[in-house]
């Protein structure tokens, strides 16, 4: 079993926070139940980045759902990747899509969707949604259940 994790560089180690998403290393491990159709959900209710023009902080509730194929994302590396946006200026749409595209590139999942529920800036919340295609049949895919903005709580 340990051989499945021999290539990991972050799990179980003391590592520095990456300075940017481009420097962050996303890692994967073998799917422990290959051939089974199931969904994995990661939720980051306190995601932060910076406005690229003003430098003001932006906040989002990110929900990432995917149906794995051969690989699953190693969660510590995902956490470090997500927190690497904290001091980087990027528009909401760019942050949201970069997260989804990096995970798709790493894992080649059967299916993936992201819901990025951004808190208002200038009085307007921006929500970004994307998925790789139609959800697969036979997999329970619950709603993301992030309420429409009313204090987003």
UniProtKB/Swiss-Prot annotation:
Q: According to its UniProt record, which reaction does this protein catalyse?
A: 7-aminomethyl-7-carbaguanine + 2 NADP(+) = 7-cyano-7-deazaguanine + 2 NADPH + 3 H(+)
Q: Where is it located?
A: Cytoplasm
Coarse class of the primary localization is cytoplasm
Keyword RNA-binding carried by entry: no
Which keywords, in A-to-Z order, does the entry hold?
Cytoplasm, NADP, Oxidoreductase, Queuosine biosynthesis
Q: Which Gene3D superfamilies match?
A: 3.30.1130.10
Q: Which InterPro entries match?
A: GTP-CH-I_C/QueF, NADPH_dep_7-cyano-7-deazaG_red, QueF, QueF_type1
Q: In which pathway does it act?
A: tRNA modification; tRNA-queuosine biosynthesis
Give me any GO biological process, just one.
Answer: tRNA modification
Q: What is its EC number?
A: 1.7.1.13
Q: What GO CC annotations are associated with the protein?
A: cytoplasm
The record's annotation in SUPFAM superfamilies points to: Tetrahydrobiopterin biosynthesis enzymes-like
Give the enzyme's main class according to its UniProt record, as a single word.
oxidoreductase
- Which residues act catalytically here? 51 (thioimide intermediate), 58 (proton donor)
Tell me which Pfam families the record gives: QueF
Which residues are noted in the entry as substrate-binding? 73-75, 92-93
One GO molecular function term of this record is: preQ1 synthase activity
Domain of life the protein comes from: Bacteria
Functional note: Catalyzes the NADPH-dependent reduction of 7-cyano-7-deazaguanine (preQ0) to 7-aminomethyl-7-deazaguanine (preQ1).
Recorded family membership: Belongs to the GTP cyclohydrolase I family. QueF type 1 subfamily.
Protein name per the record = NADPH-dependent 7-cyano-7-deazaguanine reductase
